């Protein structure tokens, strides 16, 4: 785990609450608006920012995030420009961890060693690469860890106790528990099952466990946050961005304020989780 991410989890744990992890697609709807969104996420209460890297074949993404990726690609977003987003944000914020989330193909084309060097220089703290299983750790995970960049793994309800140790073997930063099977932005999670799932994962690791997929409201964030170390919100933010755009997919005056308002509500939810868990 990077020092910045470790410090963030420690600081938030000292407050007695879960972290709020927010995802959006880098370059959606354009570079400058994305940078403003990153800053708004932090100002609204996001503890960790997941920065999506657009890809032309996003097999694990739901319709909303697929469309966001298409808008970003149309606007000219690339992996290099996504790293530049991180670099620009990091110039003004040295504390908020940044996690890149995407697919291996753009990294492979960019060049693994070059990518890791540039990501570290840009202030990236971790990555989630959804199409690289543990059996391919030598491709990117092990080199990333050697550079000091966390490699965050996904676990799902179908990750059984035989598979879980392999998934967690080289995981760093935190474990991202997908609270349902399927694609991102699916139906709401069954919060009654989440506590048991988090406990099962924690029996195998000391890493924080963050739960996502299906979190849309402050109430969802509060309910999940009462049993997890963190709450991940993505599709709701992407949908908020999309709803504010013109028919041509351009940003409006409502784009950034709309995201900030949504995330302020979600942040209030995770802070209320501390109170709910203590009752």
UniProtKB/Swiss-Prot annotation:
SUPFAM superfamilies: Ribulose-phoshate binding barrel (SSF51366)
GO cellular component: cytosol
CDD domains to which the protein is assigned, alphabetical: Tryptophan_synthase_alpha (cd04724)
Pathway where this protein functions: Amino-acid biosynthesis; L-tryptophan biosynthesis; L-tryptophan from chorismate: step 5/5
Catalytic activity: (1S,2R)-1-C-(indol-3-yl)glycerol 3-phosphate + L-serine = D-glyceraldehyde 3-phosphate + L-tryptophan + H2O
Top-level enzyme category: lyase
Gene3D superfamilies: Aldolase class I
InterPro entries: Aldolase_TIM, RibuloseP-bd_barrel, Trp_synthase_alpha_AS, Trp_synthase_suA
General function of this protein: The alpha subunit is responsible for the aldol cleavage of indoleglycerol phosphate to indole and glyceraldehyde 3-phosphate.
UniProt similarity note: Belongs to the TrpA family.
Assembly with partners or alone: Tetramer of two alpha and two beta chains.
Protein name per Swiss-Prot or TrEMBL: Tryptophan synthase alpha chain
């Amino acid at each position: 785990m990077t020092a910045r991410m470790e410090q963030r989890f420690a600081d938030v744990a000292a407050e007695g609450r879960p972290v709020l992890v927010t995802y959006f697609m880098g370059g959606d709807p354009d570079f400058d608006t994305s940078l403003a969104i990153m800053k708004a996420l932090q100002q609204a209460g996001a503890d960790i920012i997941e920065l999506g890297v657009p890809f032309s074949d996003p097999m694990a993404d739901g319709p909303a995030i697929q469309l966001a990726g298409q808008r970003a690609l149309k606007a000219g977003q690339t992996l290099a420009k996504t790293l530049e987003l991180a670099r620009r944000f990091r110039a003004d914020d040295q504390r908020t961890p940044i996690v890149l989330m995407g697919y291996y193909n753009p990294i492979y084309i960019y060049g693994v060693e070059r990518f890791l060097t540039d990501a570290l220089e840009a202030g990236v703290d971790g990555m989630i690469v959804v199409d690289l299983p543990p059996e391919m750790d030598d491709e990117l995970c092990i080199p990333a860890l050697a550079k000091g960049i966390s490699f965050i793994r996904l676990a799902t309800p179908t990750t059984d106790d035989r598979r879980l140790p392999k998934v967690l073997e080289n995981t760093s930063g935190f474990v991202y528990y997908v609270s349902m099977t399927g694609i991102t932005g699916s139906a709401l999670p069954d919060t009654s099952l989440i506590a048991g799932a988090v406990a099962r994962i924690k029996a195998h690791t000391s890493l924080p466990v963050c739960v996502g997929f299906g979190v849309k409201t402050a109430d969802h964030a509060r309910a999940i946050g009462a049993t997890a170390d963190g709450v991940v919100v993505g599709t709701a933010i992407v949908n908020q961005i999309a709803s504010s755009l013109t028919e041509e997919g351009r940003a409006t005056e409502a784009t950034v304020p709309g995201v900030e308002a949504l995330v302020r509500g979600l942040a209030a939810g995770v802070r209320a989780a501390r109170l709910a868990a203590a009752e």
